[in-house]
């Protein structure tokens, strides 16, 4: 029994040392009240609040972000070069597939709903109510609009 306990303690200590040597964080905790919301990336219309939970969506590697949208917030048809995993944290979020925004073809996701959108799949979205979603995927994150005129980052600034 003592020998088993000794092996277990040695294993745990070795794992902790290995985690420190790699420079990787041992864990990440996120408490909702501690989340700092800010402006979204420029490829999204104004009105959305955005936060990075883990990783760096602008670099290769895993990332987790959250987006908070008011009721009626739309995301025009677009696609991503990597898979996108979406989980609804609050509200009702709707997704549709295709190159044209068609509200009648959308599927509504309540709290806890999940969608996997494979790389290059054309899709669009609507916050049916005030909604918060969590997105995770493999960076770098990129969003390409089917119609380039829908991309707010490409528009001339309002005067």
What are these language model-derived features?
Residues 75-77, 95-96, 117, 122-128:
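Short beta-strand His + acidic residue motifs that chelate non-heme Fe in jelly-roll/DSBH
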Residues 53, 112, 133:
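Divalent metal-coordination and catalytic microenvironments
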Residues 56-58, 99-120:
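Short acidic-glycine-tyrosine-enriched beta hairpin
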Residues 70-73, 80-100:
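Glycine- and acidic-residue-biased ligand/ion/polar-headgroup-sensing regions
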Residues 1-4:
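Positively charged n-region of N-terminal signal peptides that target proteins for export
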Residues 6-16:
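Bacterial N-terminal signal peptides
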Residues 28, 104-107, 124-159:
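Double-stranded beta-helix
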């Amino acid at each position: 029994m003592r020998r088993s306990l000794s092996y277990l303690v040695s294993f745990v200590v070795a794992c902790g040392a290995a985690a420190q040597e790699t420079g990787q964080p041992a864990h990440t905790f996120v408490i909702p009240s501690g989340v700092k919301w800010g402006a979204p990336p420029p490829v999204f219309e104004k009105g959305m609040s955005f936060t990075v939970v883990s990783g760096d969506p602008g670099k290769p590697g895993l990332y987790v972000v959250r987006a908070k949208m008011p009721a009626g917030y739309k995301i025009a048809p677009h696609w991503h070069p990597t898979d996108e995993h979406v989980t609804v944290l609050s509200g009702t979020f709707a997704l549709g597939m295709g190159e044209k925004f068609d509200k009648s073809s959308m599927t509504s996701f309540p709290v806890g709903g999940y969608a996997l959108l494979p790389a290059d799949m054309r899709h669009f979205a609507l916050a049916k109510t005030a909604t918060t979603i969590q997105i995770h995927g493999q960076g770098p994150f990129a969003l390409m609009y089917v119609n380039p005129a829908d991309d707010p980052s490409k528009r001339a600034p309002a005067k």
